[in-house]
Design a protein with these regions (language model features):
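Phosphate/nucleotide-binding beta-alpha loop and adjacent structural elements of enzyme active sites
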Residues: 1-224
């Protein structure tokens, strides 16, 4: 069905121009360029949300990549199990330590968050918090170790305000992703370059290589 829909979209593009993106801000097209000579690889998608909608990794998945999809929302992995059976699909939150944490579930799943203050800000029409549930959480390094995942090519994080906490749970010596996507909501580039997140990434040997409206692309200085 998805391929049929894509064919219909391509049919209306003049002269076959244009490219289809599944990500929220075209992040998957940036990744396609970054990995244009790599047909297979391993991704880890934290805050994966949906196997296709707003997905940074679906375009790579179609090319032959496989990996780990992680989302804390109850029931979120049912669609992944059906549409990405070759991946490891995990319903768990990523935090600095093993714990159970309150998770705010919205009528728009892309807004789901552990951040109570952000949830209060977003809880207004047309969006609404449907429930607050307790979910299991653990550091990303522990989760990947449990599933025997070593070096990866791409780490994509969309944790709605908790991206920096997720980054701090990575074992950078083991995973050493070639590319990291994370969010930063400042519109001021001077503020971005002065941020704790940017300092953290540069200290680990990463450079800011691209940016969409909210997403930052960091590439490893030792990337092959």
């Amino acid at each position: 069905m998805i391929r049929a829909q894509l064919d219909r979209i391509r049919a209306v593009l003049p002269g076959g121009m244009g490219r289809v993106s599944f990500a929220q801000e075209g992040e998957d097209l940036v990744l396609a360029r970054m990995f244009e000579h790599q047909d297979t690889g391993i991704y880890v998608d934290v805050g994966a949300h949906h196997p296709i909608r707003f997905s940074n990794t679906y375009l790579l998945h179609r090319r032959g990549w496989r990996g780990v999809n992680i989302d804390a929302a109850p029931g979120s992995m049912k669609a992944f199990a059906r549409m990405r059976p070759g991946d490891i699909n995990l319903e768990v939150g990523i935090t600095a330590r093993e714990e159970t944490r309150a998770f705010h579930v919205f009528n728009e799943p892309a807004l789901n968050t552990f951040d109570a203050e952000r949830a209060r800000t977003l809880d207004r029409p047309p969006y609404k918090v449907l429930q607050v549930c307790q979910v299991r959480c653990a550091p990303l390094a522990k989760i990947l170790r449990e599933h025997a995942i070593g070096a990866i090519d791409l780490l994509s994080i969309d944790a709605e305000g908790f991206d920096f906490e997720v980054l701090q749970t990575v074992d950078w010596e083991v995973a050493r992703p070639k590319v990291v996507i994370t969010e930063h909501f400042s519109r001021d580039l001077t503020e971005l370059f002065a941020s704790e997140l940017h300092a953290y990434m540069t200290a680990r040997g990463y450079q800011l290589s691209a940016k969409t409206f909210n997403s930052l692309f960091y590439t490893s200085a030792t990337r092959q």
